[in-house]
């Protein structure tokens, strides 16, 4: 299980972005995305936290033809960080 933090900027509205992420997780994330939270920073930026079962499988979700086309159409840019617990 991996924890991720993603900074995302986009040209579409935040509402459309959030609806698309919800749909994407439901359709492609079963068994991969265990939990996620989106945080609206402004109308064109979001921070999100994901718990995923496999980093490799999550990266494949980001790299599908559908995801690439959506990113291009909405000028969506992601910066993905892997989080680790400090003990």
Language-model segments: residues:
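Short S/T/G/P-rich N-terminal loop/turn motif that feeds into the first structured element of a domain
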Residues: 1-68, 78-87
């Amino acid at each position: 299980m991996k924890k991720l933090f993603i900074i995302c900027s986009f040209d579409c509205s935040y509402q459309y972005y959030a609806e698309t992420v919800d749909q994407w997780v439901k359709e492609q994330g079963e068994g991969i995305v265990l939990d996620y939270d989106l945080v609206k920073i402004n109308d064109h930026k979001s921070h999100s936290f994901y718990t995923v079962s496999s980093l490799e499988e999550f990266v494949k979700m980001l790299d599908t033809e559908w995801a690439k086309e959506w990113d291009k159409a909405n000028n969506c840019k992601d910066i993905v960080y892997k989080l680790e617990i400090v003990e």
